[in-house]
A protein has these predicted regions:
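A short helix->loop->beta-strand "cap" motif at the edges of active sites that frequently abuts
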Residues: 148-155, 227-230
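Alpha-helix C-terminal capping segments
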Residues: 25, 33-44, 286-289
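Positively charged, low-complexity intrinsically disordered leader regions
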Residues: 1-15
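Conserved post-catalytic alpha-helical subdomain immediately downstream of the catalytic base
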Residues: 260-329
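Conserved N-terminal subdomain of the carbohydrate kinase-like
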Residues: 43-132, 322-336
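Short catalytic helix/loop segments, enriched in acidic residues and glycine
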Residues: 15-34
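Histidine-anchored nucleotide/phosphate-binding helix
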Residues: 29-39, 142-148
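Conserved phosphate/ATP/ADP-binding segment of small-molecule kinases
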Residues: 166-255
Length: 336
């Protein structure tokens, strides 16, 4: 459940101020996860609200082409949210500008969604911290969704995904403290736990690209103790530049008190948007398919590593491609 947006982006690493043309695609945190799961052969259903006009239909079609079930999408409202993405390179970071005010989902109400019907026969519900950031009414919708999911015995995952351009840390903390009481599997990056809950790893300097992996064991345990999570996953990005990142993750399983770190990939980035979402999609797939804690985090990180090589929000990879990389084949050699 979340907002599916139009993505407008200059071609060929151009800056906004020099671009004459923009590429038109779609994306959004939870939609990106749904596409990943559909590509892995899972039955993925996406829930949102979109206008009943041609642009709203184009957004829906962008999901249908990859096998996502769009039958639960509510039609109504006037706007599809937009985000403008300027891709960075080398020492110039990427820039994202939102134009989401008065979008259909931002102006939705709890009456728009019949969650009891939506959750019939469902195993897993996923949302991110981006969606409740759209406004108090959307926080209410997320809360109703979580309550219904719990009533139906559905597992709930949430990627904290703090976005400072959408709300303040204080607003995020209040809303996410409320919503996280329902969550079973929490996903965070190396900064989200600090930004939202004030929980941070020692001896870590994000901007210098210095990650203290061991410090994130404490972060995961504090999150689990605070909210009763069953599992906590934390992605660890070492940003050498906009073009080159180190990429790994940790998965903490509370029941076994097991902390598993993935191998680290050194990435040459084509498009990092959706990188965290592709991790989430990979993790959900792995957990639903009974993979061990170590195998689950390896699959999720490998899926995300591959996404960084793919243009657009969606992760266009197969299970076999992910498993091949997770198993150690990162050569990138041509397959004949």
């Amino acid at each position: 459940f979340g907002e599916l947006m139009i993505r407008l982006q200059p071609f060929n690493y151009e800056r906004f101020v020099q671009a004459n043309n923009l590429e038109f695609t779609f994306g959004g945190g939870e939609a990106n996860v749904a596409v990943s799961l559909a590509n892995y052969g899972m039955d993925a259903v996406y829930v949102t609200k979109l206008p009943a006009h041609a642009i709203g239909q184009a957004a829906i079609n962008s999901l249908r082409r990859y096998g996502v079930d769009t039958s639960k999408i509510v039609r109504g409202g006037d706007r599809v949210g937009i985000y403008f993405n300027e891709k960075g390179a080398s020492q110039r970071g990427s820039v994202c500008i939102y134009d989401r005010a008065h979008s259909a989902i931002q102006e939705a109400s709890t009456a728009d969604f019949d969650w009891d019907s939506i959750f019939e026969g469902v195993d897993w519900f996923h949302f991110t911290g981006i969606t409740p950031a759209l406004g108090p009414n959307v926080v209410d919708i997320c809360r109703e969704a979580c309550k219904a999911a719990k009533a139906h015995g559905v597992k709930i995952s949430c990627d904290l995904n703090y976005r400072g351009k959408l709300w303040t840390r204080e607003e995020a903390r209040a809303a996410m403290t409320d919503l996280c009481q329902y969550v079973d599997v929490c996903i965070s990056n190396e900064e989200d736990a600090k930004d939202v809950f004030g929980i941070e790893a020692e001896a870590t300097d994000i901007y210098a690209g210095e990650i203290n992996r061991e410090g994130y064991k404490s972060v995961a345990k504090q999150l689990a103790d605070k909210f009763g999570f069953e599992k906590v996953a934390i992605t660890l990005r070492e940003s050498h530049s906009a073009s080159d990142n180190g990429w790994s993750a940790m998965l903490y399983d509370v029941a076994s008190n097991e902390y598993c770190f993935s191998k680290k990939y050194e990435l040459r980035i084509i498009d990092r948007v959706g990188g965290g979402d592709s991790f989430g999609g990979g993790l959900i797939y792995a957990l639903l398919n009974g993979k061990s804690t170590q195998d689950a985090v390896e699959f999720a990180v490998a899926a995300s590593a591959l996404k960084h090589s793919i243009e657009g929000d969606y992760n266009m990879v197969t299970v076999s491609e992910v498993e091949k990389l997770a198993g150690g084949d990162g050569s990138g050699r041509i397959q004949r």
